[in-house]
Amino acid sequence: MGSTPAGCAILIGKFLCRFVVRSRNMGSIIIPEGYTSRQNIMETEIAIKLIKDFFERELSKELNLTRISAPLFVKKTTGLNDNLNGVERPVAFEMKEAEGEVIEIVHSLAKWKRLALKRYGVNSGEGIYTDMNAIRRDEDLDNTHSIYVDQWDWERVIDREDRNIDFLKEIVNKIYSVFKKTEEMLAQKYENYTKFLPEKVTFITSQELENLYPEISSGERENRFAKEHGAIFIMQIGKMLESKERHDGRAPDYDDWELNGDLIMWNPVLDSALELSSMGIRVDSESLERQLKELNLEERKELEYHRMLLNNELPLTIGGGIGQSRICMFLLQRAHIGEVQASLWSDEIIAECEKNGINLL
């Protein structure tokens, strides 16, 4: 794929960043002033394929991962589904051959991957990744949230001595290098594409961030810090802060809240922070016990997956999810995630997008 004509180039320097983005709220979406999609739908589809193929290949090389097949649904009784913040309802059904067995569409594969690593006999320093597709029926729809989730879910076996902040940062930097390589690839492929990612990620803990901006909400802190630094990794998501609040909710049974975090970039189109990856070193038996107790969810210890963890039957791992559509939206500098994925939207959102030059797929 060579250079595109100026009329359909992905313009950042010439168009999107030549003015200050002043957004007017349209209910659940934001329309950046003067925004218009810079490619038609077919050109966008070609660019999406280009980004996904390149990013997936480079991620696999950086983290030493092998692609495997993944399920769309799991049995509720296994405890393998991701409970997210604990309030989201999974899409559930029964199948004819297993009456009475509740089957759930996955929210993510955070726990399933760890079981797969054991079953497939993956060695330390090696890992797996999947093309994960999920339905999150309770998402609040906006520019960056959809009920359809597509991400690379990855997991890698580690040793006990790797369970520390320095190793977590090392993996984050490897992932960020893939973002930088993908950006460079786009700059070579597209005329007038201006690179905008900073050279490195800035790391901060959720408590340090609260200390820095104690007077504002956690979301506003993310915006403030991301705007200043461009690419940030907020560590220790889910743990209780000194304010007796949590920076954000996180399920107690996959990430160790002391050894996890969110990779967030500053999105100049929407003039806001954008989370592109959530990841962490996973719980061991000790941290699982502690976190379940903290949230009064000790009944989960009776589930098959949790029993295996408490009995130290699963490998120690690090893993996470990287949003495919969000990466495409971000690197192509689109205003709405519906420009890079086919999903369902309210009539109001569709009407506002059509009126304001946003081409939903």
Regions inferred by a protein language model and the residue ranges of each:
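Extended, charged alpha-beta segments that form solvent-exposed binding/catalytic grooves
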Residues: 125, 130-220
